[in-house]
Amino acid sequence: MSEEKLKAKVEQASGSLKEGAGKLTGDKELEAKGFVEKTIAKGKELADDAKEAVEGAVDAVKEKLK
C-alpha cells in the first residue's frame, strides 16, 4: 500500500469518526465536516489507485517494447 493510500485511509477513518460523533451528538456541522473529509479522502484513494494502474500499464508497455 502506498503512503498516499495509507494517508487517505486514515483521513477516511477520521472523517467517519467525526461524522459519527456529529450524528450521536446532534451536531450537524461536525457530521457534515466528517462526511466531507471522508468523501475527499475516498477520492484521494481512488486517484492513487488510478495512478498505480497507469504506472502498471506503462511498465507493461515498456517491457513489451524491450
Curated annotation (Swiss-Prot):
Matches recorded under InterPro entries: CsbD, YjbJ_sf
Disordered: annotated segments: 1-22
Signal sequence, renumbered to the chain: none
Disulfide cysteine pairs (residue numbers): none
Compositionally biased intervals (Basic and acidic residues): 1-10
Entry superkingdom: Bacteria
Record-stated family: Belongs to the UPF0337 (CsbD) family.
Name of this protein: UPF0337 protein M6_Spy1542
Organism of origin: Streptococcus pyogenes serotype M6 (strain ATCC BAA-946 / MGAS10394)
